[in-house]
Amino acid sequence: MLPYNSNYLSDNGKRKFSDENPQSEVYGSSQTGLPSSYGNPQSYGTPPVQQSSAMYGVNNSMGGGMYNTSENTQFMNTDYSQTSSYASTPMSNAYSRDAPAAINNNFGYSYVGQSSQPVPSYNPLPSYNTASLPNAGIPAAMPGMPSGYPGTVPIPQGGYNAHYSSPYNNGYPIGAVNPTSAIPAQPPAQPVNNVLPSYVRSNSRSSARSTARSAPRSTQRSRSSSANPVTTPPVNNTLLTPPAPPVELPPVTTTSPNAIIRSVQWIRSFVPQAPIHQVINTLAQTKWDETAALSILSQKYLSCDLGIPIQEHKRFKQSPVASNMPTYGSSNRTVQSQKRSIRDKYIQMPNDSTQASLMPSYTRKTSNASKKLTTEEDEFYDSEEEPEAIVHRDTSALERTVLNFINSSTAKELSDTASCPLSHSKLLLEHRPFQTLAEACIIKHPDDVPSKPGRRGRRREKNPMGQKIVNACMETMEGYYAIDNLIAKCEFLGNRISKGMASWGIKLEMSNGELNIVDMESVPTEAADNSDFPKFVTEQPKTLASDVQLKSYQLVGVNWLHLLYQQKLSGILADEMGLGKTCQVVAFFALLLEQGHHGPHLVVVPSSTLENWLRELARFCPSLRVEPYYGSQQERANIREAIEENEIKYDILVTTYQLATNNKEDRSFLKHQNFDVCVYDEGHYLKNRMSERYKHLMNLNANFRLLLTGTPLQNNLKELVSLLAFILPNMFDSDMDDLDVIFKAKPTADADIEQALLSKQRISRAKTMMTPFVLRRRKNQVLNDLPKKTQIIEHCKLSENQLEIYNRYAALQKNQQLRRDDKRNKRSKNDEESDGKSLSAGHVLMQLRKAANHALLFRKFYDDEKLKQMAKDIMQEEQYKNANEQYIYEDMEVMSDFELHRLCRSFPTLQSYTLKDDPWMDSGKIRVLKELLPKMKEEGSRILLFSQFTQMLDILEQVLDTLKISYVRLDGSTQVEVRQDIIDQFHKEEDVTVFLLSTKAGGFGINLACANVVILYDCSYNPFDDLQAEDRAHRVGQVREVTVIRLITDNTIEEYIQKLANTKLALDMSLSSDGKDREEIGERLVQDMLDEENNGNNTKPEITGNESDGEFKVSSSNNSKQTDAEETNTGVPLEGSQPNSVEKTDLADGDEKANIKTEMKSETVEGDNKELRETMKGENVQTDSNAAVPSSKSSTEEPNESVLSGHLDLDTEASPVVSTIEKTTKGDVSVTEEQQSANIDGQLEKPEIEESKKPDVLNQVSLSIEEEKPKNKESEVDNNAAKD
């Protein structure tokens, strides 16, 4: 039996199984057991073998004493350094060097099903291999020997070599010689071709090295005695001729020696009677098929066929799990992994001599040692100089201002300014007028409870209500003064920019708060020559690539950036998405490079756009040396070390927001680079001055800061000041403490503090002051040839499974609404209970959205009994053998049907539990897609399919597989290194029809202009997210008309979300807060809609109010035209909820997790404050081509001068973008919109829709906004902005 994983065939395997060799005349010389040519000590020094304690002539190679000769070297085992005697038997040598210690059976192991079993061994006798008689190699009747074992016939003895005195090997063992012939002593003959030529491992190691390693030390000392260290047996040597008949073997070209040895080993474990040469011959005949050879040999020696059971055994036990499972077809073409890192793909080699001669010499900007080093105490001061001391105003003057304000303000204004309840401000004003602030400070609230005793029994005096209000007003007023002071400073700086642009012949209009210079026509060819300002650059930089041609508005943008840079100021480039902001920035870098400004510069981008930036920089300006600062922690450490040691020289360093802010080492490295220009892509990430991201990035030193954003500036004083503080940090250092008082103020239950901050006068001044620092152009202004964008709403119906699930959660929401109404007045006093109920309410809203999407997002098909059986069955899998069955069952309980289906497809033991009959096709929206997608594919359209939920993307993958439509996918879990590869794949492979994207990860910063259809499978609470997704296709480079299709499920929560997005209120909301705040507010508004519908007996609510001052109220309309058929489909009426804390984990996240919490309080108060209660009555639609959006009775009114609400005073002069909503094939009424102001700023004109033209459509009623007198506020919102 063969030893496991050994090369015992180092002798037997090299025999030429042929009788063609001539017979020798004489045996080897006396006492050698070998022919004289192999064993003559006179010719070759020493005997080739030595006495061994191992049985049957296997030499104990560890004992040393062996000498190498040119003939016997080939019989060494080079793998185990084992030198066997020439005719060693096929058995295990437990004493050989490097042989496995566990293999100590005389005949090795029998391997059956990968488990070793000993084979019966020979009965050891003391006379074995001692060979006291010359011909006693192995006796013919050895006990314990398997029947049919070859070579048990005594071997005749020939002549002896007197110089060879080995007492143990006087005779030839089994199969070593032909017992019918004798071999004369002769010199070595020429080597012959080996039957297994690959045994000589010339490819893996040299023969000399193999020989030197396998031979004992004495052999190495006498190496010079052999001219040829490795040879093959002589041609005329018949010692290699076995008793078996010869078989011509095909040449072995693909089977390695080790593989053949393992095959022989495995076959003989089943059929030990088969001779080794017979096994090898059979393997050669079957082309080295182990199972086929075993089948032949087992039938010959065992009279049974072992091939069939062995084949089944190997297939199940040795093959991968996937081979035992059904093959599931997939149309997924997504790139799975990258071949190179981002740095390897985009790092640039040093420029050649030609390019270098055109550019100025590289100079590295070094820090000044004399300057103050930034420490942890002053890390939030961006300037390296000592910050100026904060100068406070005269306290007496501030007190007089506050006193006058208290004596003249209304209760609501005082409540907003002091952040106190409205009832407290009313009580204070009942005692006015006040002569001094001391009189106001002593006013107490009648319900004030005396303070509790302290530890030592003393009572702490609580501040009276009046003193709290006075202190809060003084802090707020001081913040107002700081803002006014900053606005005055910014106006002074802005005048410098205005003069510089005036030198070009451009007259600025300061009314809109932003520049909108479009083309070169407004720039005179010969502007006034002013040495204080740079000249207008009329030609693009020469270092730009030859195939890059800047448009006129882009060249204007480069000049504007250059002007700000020369004046040592900063700015915000806020062009609409798709207008080439990246190209303008690269051209600006190229212009600086031509002027000798090598930086270093920094570009901070979102993770999803990192590779796109690197590609654009390399494409637009190859002369720039760009270094990506991205990778693992060790890779970044290597980059830092190389840069600090000046081994890497760069002009631009590109990194991500996450790396620039999260890790301390990264922050410290970037902080000390002393950048010249810092560019922040998606600059709206920096609107929250209290976020950690803002603070860390403010710490980066830079001479010029540029924010890029497609998001418009908003009528939010906190955001405007935050952006100003970021781009002009030196100016804001001394006033930040005063500003923090305003920023940290929390809204009350009665009113939002922003209602006091967002006065018309201050907003107007702030935006006027920011005008020179903000450049924004819109698509309709610069791209007259941009294809139009068509909006289509596809109405879908709930399937039976969806309807059942939806009604269940709608009923649950109704019960929660009733419980909340009972405890409405106690919510503010019992926060813990309120928090718990609100979490459930938010969970129900999420479940309603999921039910409107697909039933497989829930667990219905897999009941508890089936899950228990599945948990039991999966325990048979290898990776679950040691798992806890109960834990597995509990994990399965929280999984959806589709997640369980995918789990079943992954394991052979669960194949029977997979879903049958394609239930993923059973959904209202999927039915619509089933009709749309094949038609679009035939037309050659390419589709972007967005969804908020990653689980929904999983289901859509299965749908596309069923429809045989190829696709790629990108979501928040996609590796950053692969994202650009997937985008490139979609661009290049035109046969890929669909691109699946999550709205968060795929809706920002990527260019997919090769697609002409955008399908929004579900809508976001934040309408701006959907607009961003649309602009992935409707952008520069698009040559086809773009169609945007929204899938809306009738009579569900999605109708409310869509109606919210179509109102001016929603647009105001989207422009007055951060992204997370927008989702929070949107969710709260939808909840209020549902609440109003339920409270009004299922009547449709109506928004009324004064559009001009941004105030809205809620009223219920009884003009509902809902039919019985509609109520049947709707099921249980929806009940809204106002959660205190809603945590959403189901949404598909992009580079950040969406962990959104919204806190709301509801308290009924009295007063003449205005209501801000949002619900929706319905949406007007019209088939006339001139109708655009829901009607607004006050849409033609001019805005008032004062806006005290938190909503934007919209610009009604914005040019519209042509957008047409066509009628769908489903028979649903849709809207045709002409001249809809659908730009990103949310400036939406709402033309009047005549009553006579309003169609009678189910679930769609008019939205009216009208003025009303202020009423009591019944519902207030406490929105704590989540950190960016």
UniProtKB/Swiss-Prot annotation:
Q: What is its main location?
A: cytoplasm
Which InterPro entries would you find in this protein's record?
Helicase_ATP-bd, Helicase_C-like, P-loop_NTPase, SNF2-like_sf, SNF2/RAD54-like_C, SNF2_N
Q: Output compositional bias ranges, type Low complexity.
A: 201-241
Q: Where is the composition biased (Basic and acidic residues)?
A: 818-831, 1143-1177, 1243-1256, 1266-1284
Biological process GO terms, please? DNA double-strand break processing; positive regulation of transcription by RNA polymerase II
Instruction: Tell me which GO cellular component terms the UniProt record holds.
Output: chromatin; cytosol; nucleus
- The entry's protein name is ATP-dependent helicase fft2
